[in-house]
Structures are given as C-alpha cells and as structure tokens.
C-alpha cells in the first residue's frame, strides 16, 4: 500500500468504527464535527436574531351581567338576525348573544347587542359596531345592524424617517376592516429588528366607522457588531472557538435582517483547527416571512502515518430557503406553518486525495407546524416537523445505501415542546423552563440525520467528544433559574435526560444518558453577556468516557 493511500485506508476504517459507536478524541470525525457545527450555527442564529417580542394588545370588551330573570314588557325571541354591510361575514358573532328562546325587554335587547359586540372585540374587531335600530319585536325577530370599522389611512407620525416602511410589515391596507390581530402582526414585524421599535395608535377619522393607523417608528444605529468566545468546540477541531458577526438591520428598509459571521478556533495551533462562515437574510411580508441562510465550515487535523504525518481536512456547505406563514392568531394562541428547502454538501480529504466514501451531497424539504399558547403567565410552544430527502439539486446516493445503513432520502419526524413558567415566591423571582425534543424515523439514517445526545446542546454533563446517536430518540432538558435581584444575573440548575433507539442503537454501548448542571448567566455593562456552568454525568453506560463538562460563553456587542 502506497504511503498516501495508507492514511486514506485508516480514515475509512475509522469511518466504519464511527458508524457503530463514536470517534475518539485523537482522530477526526467528519459526521460528529458537522453535527456539532450545526448546533453551533443554531445557537449563533438565536444570539444574532433574537425572537421578536410577542405582541398581545389588551382587549377592551365590557364585563356583562347575565340576562335579567324577568322583564316587563318582554317579547319572546325566536330568531336573531344581522343586517348591514358585511353582515354575512360576521354572522358567527350572533351565537354569543344566546338570545333565542328568551323573553327580552329593553334591558335584555341591549345586553344581547353588547354580547355580540364583545364577541367581535374578542376576535380583534375593536372598531366594528353593532347597533339595535327601532323595530317591532312582536314577530319574535331581533335584528342587529352591523357597521364595519374600516381603515381610512395609514401613516407614520411626524417626524417620519425615510427608512420607515409599513407596506410589508402591516397585513392590512386602507379600506380593510380593522383587526387588532393585523396590528399585532405589524408590531412584531417592526420589532423583529433589534435596533428599531414601533407603536401603532388607532385614531378616529372623519367618516363614520373609519379609523386612521398612526405608526410611531424609531431606529437607532442599524449596524451591530458582536464578538463571541466559547469553549464549545471539540478537541479534534479546536476546543476554543471565536466569532465576529456583523449585522445590518433594516438593510433594504423593509424591516429586513442581514448578518454575516465568521468564526475560527482560537488559542490553538497546528495540527488541528477549524473555520466557519454564515450568512443570513430574512424579511417579513405581512403574515409571511422569507429567509435564506448559507453556511460553510472547514476543519483540519494532522494525523500520523507509518513514516510521516498527513493533513486530513473536511469541507461542508449548508444552504436553506425558508418560507413561513402565521395561519392563525388570537389573544392567547398563534399557529405558524413553515416550509424549508435545504441542501448539504460535505467532502473530506487526506492531503489532496478525496475520500470518496465520505463525499455527501443531499437535498430535501421540511414541513413544519408550530403552535404558541399563553397559559396565564406561562408560555407553551409546540412544534411538529416532517423532513424528507429528495433527488433535487444534484443529490448523490449516500455511501451507506450499499449496506442498507442509511440513505440520501430520509423521512424524519421531529417534535419539540417547550414550557416556560415564571414564578414569584415572596420577593424572589424564579423561572421554570422545560424542553422536550424527539425524533422518529422508520428507516436507517446516515450519521448526520440521526438523533444525538451527549453535550452542552443536548444532554449536559458530557463534553460532547463522544455521544450516542441513532434513528430515533428523545431528550428532556429542565432548568430552574433564580433572578439575583435587579443585577441582571441569573443562577440556574439543570437536569437533563436522553435516550436513543432504532437499528443503529444495537451497536452502541448504551442508549441512555442523564446529567446535571449548575451555572450562572447574565449581562454586564449592557454590552457583555455571559454563560458559565459546570455539569456532571448522572447516568451513562459503562465504558462511556467523557471529559470535564464545565464550559463558558462570552458575547460582547457594539
């Protein structure tokens, strides 16, 4: 065997070992490195693109008493009707009156009208009015007249900036029926830009039933620079990782977001290292949102051959185009449907010789349904996603297809649940956060598509260099945090549990991990945020080696 083919053969042998368990710290793992990088990219996006504040405008409905037990005179009501412009569209509100079969006098008729009015307000139609015109109730028919509240004009409050745009943020247009849900969506679209803020006032217009929307929009310097440092990398590609991210907010003045990030290993010299780049752009279109994300990642390591050392390196590229729409929102619930198309490429080399066995190029789509519900002070998020690989965009068959241990067209279902509950005990402010994530697939999956546990982003208490992965699995992360007064610091305790199953798990040394963590996070000087923790394994398979699980992350914004 030639000297250049010897390390290629070695890496191929290691690839086979990896498919059955895990890579050691002394050899590069192409799949493990990419899985870790995908988690880091997700965390980066959460830091740079914080979730826009949820806007829930207060209701203005009156508190109503029940119908009077008896009125004199009163008229037996056998039918309830609605007339007026758009009466057919709003006829559903009549059910709130509960007037049919009752004997109503003046007080009861007025109460029936107010109940219908409250039903409209509860659905966000705060300027649409219901009236009772003079009529004869002897036939037993009560007729309510609807006057729809429409938007007459939309404008920015003075002084208005030339960078302010409402056309793609506000789902409604002049002439539309005014609804608070549209205004809430618009405010979320404005506030998704971290350097901008907005408020919308409803002002009466001259015409009956017409209102003007007046938008107060302001913006600070729309350029952000952030520097970050953490020890969340791996020993194989660099434990300490740093990144610099440039964000340009409202770049095209359509409430859009853009960032470019570049990262690399720090405090590390050959024989190993890594580099990454990320680019993201997204913009709202009323209830829609369009986004594009591009990432590439490179790592290298020098491995020892029989007589000399060889450079082993890996290159990967990820791209995704996403489209989402809020399909339902009310005072307490919001439902979003999303569609994502993705492509992933990865290649690995020894010196300049490509390892064909590790060449991957896959593509596919993912359909998602997400629900956010407000349960008093608590928030419950639920997500269901279905991912399917396809042959589009030049996708290649996976090397594992020859052995039946994976494929380039997987069908994978994932479920995400998150519960957040603030608590106050005396003067102490606490918060409970519980997250559950699961994955299911009937067929065999390649390593990058498998469910992975073990590490700071999954089950804490493990350094992440070794992990358990298989086609199916679940994990449960729990935190109890305590706000340390007004200092902006938070102390937290964590308890995590995870389990994998499926065909690939038959070759693992175990299937379940559990770990605990204690840490502190917060912000200092308004610009510096940090998170530092120490974690320990509670349950692990015999022979599952793991290093120290303490860690930190720092981020400073300018």
Q: Where do the PLM segments sit?
A:
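Transmembrane beta-barrel wall of Gram-negative outer-membrane proteins
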Residues: 269-371
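Residues that define the transmembrane beta-barrel architecture of outer-membrane proteins
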Residues: 209, 238-242, 273-277, 315-319, ...
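Repeated loop/turn-to-beta-strand initiation elements of outer-membrane beta-barrel proteins
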Residues: 223-225, 252-258, 286-292, 330-335, ...
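Periplasmic polypeptide-binding modules associated with outer-membrane biogenesis and secretion
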Residues: 23-233, 263-276, 413, 435-437
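Transmembrane beta-strands of outer-membrane beta-barrel pores
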Residues: 229-233, 250, 262-268, 285, ...
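C-terminal outer-membrane beta-barrel translocator/porin domains of Gram-negative envelope proteins
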Residues: 347-497, 501-503
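Outer-membrane beta-barrel "beta-signal"
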Residues: 246, 518-522, 527, 546-558
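Membrane-embedded beta-strands of outer-membrane beta-barrel proteins
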Residues: 213, 244-246, 279, 321-323, ...
